[in-house]
Swiss-Prot record:
Function noted in UniProt: Catalyzes the conversion of heme O to heme A by two successive hydroxylations of the methyl group at C8. The first hydroxylation forms heme I, the second hydroxylation results in an unstable dihydroxymethyl group, which spontaneously dehydrates, resulting in the formyl group of heme A.
Reactions this protein catalyses: Fe(II)-heme o + 2 A + H2O = Fe(II)-heme a + 2 AH2
Keywords: Cell membrane, Heme biosynthesis, Iron, Membrane, Metal-binding, Oxidoreductase, Transmembrane, Transmembrane helix
Chief place where the protein resides: membrane
UniProt xrefs under InterPro entries: COX15/CtaA_fam (IPR003780), HemeA_Synthase_type2 (IPR023754)
Any one annotated GO CC term: plasma membrane
Membrane topology: Multi-pass membrane protein
Protein name: Heme A synthase
GO MF annotations in UniProt: metal ion binding; oxidoreductase activity, acting on NAD(P)H, heme protein as acceptor
Family: Belongs to the COX15/CtaA family. Type 2 subfamily.
Cellular compartment(s): Cell membrane
Length: 363
């Protein structure tokens, strides 16, 4: 009679490890493309190119204008929006082409991310390389990507009628969702990686997760700063307007609007957010080194603090230099590096996803 042995070795373990390595490698490629997409999106914003394409054509929009007549048609559409009539009137078609290519590249890269994610996902699913429990996570990321495309057009549409730029609310939402997709992808990839040490204690896990949350909030605040050009408002540090706490922070009515619409208040809150991330990362490093001396968790916590310190220095430099394009892009890109490492560290404190278990029948 057959007996069930739960302790029998899982015969497919090697296959599962190989599948995990393949899926993890694919997700790392997705992360690289996402990182490039965020950088190109930042350059599109900083060069004020985001409104140069006034239509959303998911399929036909892949093909740019191919002759003079098509370029004139595209330019005429741009000439009908407030950004042209109020800011760029008299722009030459050559100048228009320079901003058009940034936005076109951003949209093309966004479409590419969708393909880089969806097609391998379909292949891995059909070939049964996606283990149980992983499918919903990956489908969730795919759905977030679809939502991000819709939010991207929702953001662009806000600048086509009554404004000369996009809504800072929508810009911050678009940037934060990109960061959330990046975080989710990193967490899944890290969960599939081998871990050299057991999971950390609950307190270390919670604080590591809290840093991820703080980093996401700080990126949202950075989106508001970008949307309002608030980085150009006060280019001194550590003082603002000659004070630690500047005046007129609540000048708008109702008061909540100041935290989203006042450049001074938004920059001040972004500074406070940076100080908070710095302080919590420092505390996390000290606490982890005390609880788990010499561990991989402690080394990662130390590196995370160093990354936060570097990012803070880049932010201060960007402010003092009055937001040059290369510094602003570096600040945005390094924010994603800090976030990605924080997410990987948090998943690392929890350990790898359990390997699938199988009950083996023996006679």
């Amino acid at each position: 009679m057959a007996a069930i042995s739960a302790s029998a070795p899982y015969v497919a373990r090697d296959r599962d490890l190989r599948n995990r390595a393949l899926v993890r490698g694919w997700l790392y490629v997705v992360l690289l493309v996402l990182f490039a997409l965020v950088l190109v999106g930042g350059a599109t914003r900083l060069t004020e190119s985001g409104l140069s394409i006034t239509q959303w054509q998911p399929i036909h929009g892949v093909i740019p204008p191919l002759n003079d007549a098509e370029w004139q048609e595209e330019f005429q559409r741009y000439q009908q929006i407030p950004q042209y009539t109020e800011l760029n009137k008299g722009m030459s078609i050559e100048a228009f082409k320079s901003i058009f290519w940034w936005e076109w590249a951003h949209r093309l890269l966004a479409r590419s991310v969708g393909l880089v994610f969806a097609l391998p996902l379909l292949f891995f699913w059909v070939s049964r390389r996606i283990e149980r429990g992983l499918g919903p996570k990956l489908v969730g990321i795919l759905l977030l990507g679809g939502l991000q495309g819709a939010i991207g057009w929702w953001m662009v549409a806000s600048g086509l009628v009554d404004r000369v730029s996009v809504s800072q609310y929508r810009l911050a939402t678009h940037l934060t969702l990109a960061a959330l997709i990046f975080t989710a992808t990193m967490v899944v990839a890290r969960g599939l990686a081998p871990h050299s040490e057991p999971a950390a204690d609950r307190s270390t896990q919670r604080l590591a997760g809290f840093i991820v949350l703080l980093a996401l909030i700080q990126i949202y605040l950075g989106g508001l700063v970008a949307g309002l050009d608030a980085g150009l408002s006060y280019n001194t540090w550590p003082l603002m307007d000659g004070k630690i706490i500047p005046g007129d922070l609540l000048i708008l009515e109702p008061a909540w609007r100041n935290f989203f619409e006042s450049p001074k208040t938004v920059q001040f809150v972004h500074r406070l957010g940076a100080y908070t991330v710095f302080a919590v990362a420092l505390w996390h490093m000290i606490a982890t080194r005390r609880r788990l001396p010499g561990s991989t968790h402690a080394r990662r916590a130390t590196l995370l603090f160093v990354l936060v310190l570097v990012q803070a220095s880049i932010g201060i430099g960007t402010l003092l230099m009055q937001v040059p394009l290369h510094m602003a892009l570096t600040h945005q890109g390094f924010a994603l590096i800090v976030l990605g490492f924080a997410a990987a560290h948090w998943r690392g404190t929890k350990g790898a996803y359990p390997l699938p278990q199988e009950i083996v029948l023996r006679s």
